[in-house]
């Protein structure tokens, strides 16, 4: 179903039916940031709910686990690990935002929560619901070939999809506009004047994304991964976002001793500073891995923004899915084409999903929503289809490419990893 079509309401009615049959439910969400909102929504209608995710302390996990084992719980809500909850008599398993790659654990023990869910649904002879506005190519193919049953919700509850604009930043640079296009700048001002709220997505955390020497071309890279380190101003550290290698920022080039290094690129930390500086009415809050490390941080940011203590929410992809704020009328996407540069055959699919999902945060109430997507490659099919909310068109285009290049779902890929000490 499209974003805002009422999938959560459908989930709750299905759970209600299951509970009346004296059975139980597991509900998976892709991000810890989504659990507080979903649990709060569920608590308006149900009791005996357990919450499981990696943000809980060991003691809290143990307490929830014991409640489930002792038959004190009817509904388990959580991130991917919640699929292992020792719940008996399961009547339904629901995976929200089923397309999300976070359901797959890439480190030991390796598992895909969707595969485990399929196994548990078969074991308990219960339905498995895979919900998404942008299903994975593999899931949609299974639905098209009758392996899964396809149920579609094609309209928003308020029949009010946001108006989406694409902005070519190559043209904006020629006009002297850099970080924000004139359109996005004007729309932010308009929103703040109306006392409405704004979400800005920049899928890169940190302050500067590259520290380089203009004299000799040296770039400060991770010694393990050989990719540029990202500067984090708050801690004054250079961090690798792949292996978490950390070091303090250098003041001189190790190659030529030049002490005038260039800080290039922008992450969410720098964007928050910039937005607060150029918009006098802006009260900006940031949601990314760096601001949500502490206990209950997701919930606090969510509640503060919902209570309108802030009018601009800046974040990475964790703000793209599932969040529902009635006063948000504008979503701005900076570097909307950045994920197309990732060397992965799914980069087009991931780009489409991210843009479609974050666009769905705008105009979810009676207020009209707008979306501005900025990028240097906005004529790419995945961006155009996302701006038109055209999943089927994207799917057909993507399948042509996958078939020609022998990619899934037509062929299986095998990863062989070799390592030694």
Annotated model-derived regions:
Residues 1-417:
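Inter-lobe coupling/hinge segments of SF2-like helicase ATPases
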Residues 419-421:
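Short, intrinsically disordered, charge-balanced linker/junction segments flanking boundaries
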